[in-house]
Amino acid sequence: KGHRVVTATGTLCTEQVEPVFNVHADVRRTALVGIGAKGAQTPVLCVELEAGVAKTEQARIADELRHIGEGHVHTGRIDRFLFHPGFPVDIRHNAKIGRETLAVWAARHAQDLP
């Protein structure tokens, strides 16, 4: 069962949300996390960029991701993006993102959100 973000207006499932944003050419991968108490979480999409993409491109990429999300019913409410230098992963399964660790990081960096 995938991870879920439970907001005041509904539940978002990572396996339905992340593929929508992962199509962006500058994005290596994304991870949906929730900030706050379950049932009232704020959805935040953590973004890991492809190698060589400059930090100065983050504002443009966030705008483009926002536009991509608006084209889908289940991603239209996601408008907060945080850029992470390299997602934490489970040491036993290198591809498995450490979402709990990432959610704590996102909560600490929430003030960086536009």
Question: Where in the sequence are the language-model features?
Answer:
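Conserved C-terminal "lid"/linker of ANL adenylate-forming enzymes
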Residues: 31-36, 45, 66-114
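AMP-binding/adenylate-forming catalytic core of the ANL superfamily
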Residues: 1-74
